[in-house]
Amino acid sequence: MGISMILDNFLYLGAAKDTKDEKEMEKLKITHIFSCAGTVHSPEKYIIANEKFEDDETVDISEQIEKAYWFIERVRMKKGARVFIHCMAGKSRSASIVLSYLLKRDIHSLSDCLFYLHSKRLEIRPNDGFMNQLCDLELKLTNKQTLSKEIKEWRSLQSKALKTKIDVQTCHFIQPSLDSTKKANEQYLLHIQSISFTFFEIHLNQDKIIQLYQQQCQLLHSNNIDIKYFTSILQEELSNSTKKAFDFLLIHYYLDWQDIINNLLNYTNLKLNLN
């Protein structure tokens, strides 16, 4: 079956074994991986969110849905970055995560998202428990449900998709619009800002930042510090200070030091002479 491109030159769906095909991964320019299965070949080549969970109807995937959404959005905000979502077979767990992203990203109906995903990867088959949760998510986001949980309406759609060749040309509506992209960008920046301020309060208060800045000024015999250089100093301080700081970033949807520091320098009122 191989790797399927879901959103043009950005979002891909497949199986764990696909990461072994290094030539294909390189050809597709994959930079990030969200793993639902915990198995990635050559992990040193990618930025990875490892969120293993079982393909079981009783498993609550709400946390994974939220983490995946912000992880994928973070990738989208990075120029040229591409993300691969996978589980063992690329049919249930990873398909559910991709469906949730499509649903949250542009607030399309779940039936439209499922139809679209089938057009890109015909063999997907999220289990009934995951589909129930996606129906609940759709209701929360749109105040309506387009697939009946009682009769498991997605099964008939899946059966129809397997019997009928879906015309991909009819499915372009799912590609993000400029307006929705602008809105998503604003939401992402607000998300980063909120988490960053919480992080500052716990791990890197303003007094500490000012102290580091003054120390660097003395070392460099200058009152003007390059912003990239000072960012590296802050990153080093964070990396050496506490494991809890690193854990915080993982818990809050795989942010990295650069996300935190850029937000710090953009949104705080620190009077630092950076260029």
Curated annotation (Swiss-Prot):
- Superkingdom of the source? Eukaryota
EC number(s) stated in the UniProt entry for this protein: 3.1.3.16, 3.1.3.48
Q: Where is the Tyrosine-protein phosphatase domain?
A: 2-143
Q: Which GO terms describe its biological process?
A: negative regulation of MAPK cascade; signal transduction
Q: Does the keyword Hydrolase apply?
A: yes
- Could you tell me which InterPro entries the record lists for this protein? Dual-sp_phosphatase_cat-dom, Prot-tyrosine_phosphatase-like, Tyr_Pase_AS, Tyr_Pase_dom, TYR_PHOSPHATASE_DUAL_dom
Q: Which CDD domains match?
A: DSP (cd14498)
Role this protein plays? Has a dual specificity toward Ser/Thr and Tyr-containing proteins.
What protein family does this chain belong to? Belongs to the protein-tyrosine phosphatase family. Non-receptor class dual specificity subfamily.
The molecule here is called Probable dual specificity protein phosphatase DDB_G0271350
